[in-house]
Amino acid sequence: KNGGKIVFTMSALKSSTDIINKSYSYIFDSKLQKFLSTKNKDLILKDCTTQLEKIKKLRVLIIGDAIIDQYDSVKPLNKPIKENILATKYIGSEVYLGGVFAAAVNLSEFNNNITICTAIGNDKDIKNKINSLPKKINKKIYIEKKKITTRKKRLVDSAYKKKISEVYYIEDDFLSKSNSVKINNYLSQNLKNFDVVIMIDYGHSFINKDIYSVLAKKSKYLAINCQ
């Protein structure tokens, strides 16, 4: 009625996923690429889900630095005439639990028996957040009353959501001797109850030689995430 012409071609079908996979195949080494090309994808998926089911039953201890991640949203203003700096207008703040807390929350998606062992300072703005962690996360938290928890504050451009600068509040000698002794005693008595121990060490003075020594000697399986 309106004219036109339909042509059926015999060219190979191309999909965006196939093109992307082939274009970025250099990301994988040759052995992994060969493995992925020969294995049935459904079997790989089944194997992955089986492994995740096994993880769910493990008793896991996550020990290491507690971190407060603070994001201050700001609006950049014109550069001050008298100083060569960037001036910003404060919009608002968002505070999140990082370090061992973030790791525990992520792992709790796959595991129902997690214990956190860490120390925090006298920061009042994180107590409610700690109490609101998933109930299946057990908490063994020691308090340093005269210290502050490591806090990483970022200034974020409110329009483009990009970081402008960062300020870290860190106590170089965060963990007191008394709490170090308490933690070592706890580990010595309870490490036998955990199938896996994940040590998270960001270099913020929580993991000391004594703590590392008892973890290395008495953990059934020790995984280390450090910076």
Task: Write out the residue ranges for each language-model feature.
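Active-site cores that bind ATP or allylic diphosphates and position pyrophosphate for catalysis
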Residues: K1-K34
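Ribokinase/PfkB-type carbohydrate-kinase core domain
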Residues: N21-K82, K89-Q227
